[in-house]
A protein has these predicted regions:
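A conserved regulatory-domain signal marking ACT and ACT-like small-molecule sensing domains
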Residues: 1-89
Length: 89
């Protein structure tokens, strides 16, 4: 399954390391990534691939919520199909 992950929050050292390490621990492969800084605000969007039977998206969201809480970030995960449907014009 492909998913889209958004990460937002106040910039600080270690955000990318914390997020990507957590994803690797859940056997999630990063297919594409884009990140930017706007003043003190960090934003990252990742396209990822993972086995939803082995790691349901709800389980992955819960795991990433704990990372977000620890790092002061908002991390949201949704299926790529849902992301595309919602963002289609």
């Amino acid at each position: 399954m492909f998913g889209i992950i958004t990460v937002t929050g106040e910039d600080h050292t270690g955000i990318i390391a914390a997020v990507t390490t957590a994803l690797a621990e859940q056997d999630v492969n990063i297919v594409d990534v884009s990140q930017t800084l706007m003043d003190k605000w960090f934003t990252m969007i990742l396209r990822v691939e993972f086995n939803e039977k082995a790691t349901p998206i709800s389980t992955l969201q819960g795991y990433m919520d704990s990372v977000g809480k620890r790092e002061g970030l908002v991390i949201r995960i949704q299926s790529e199909a849902l992301f595309n449907a919602v963002n289609e014009i």
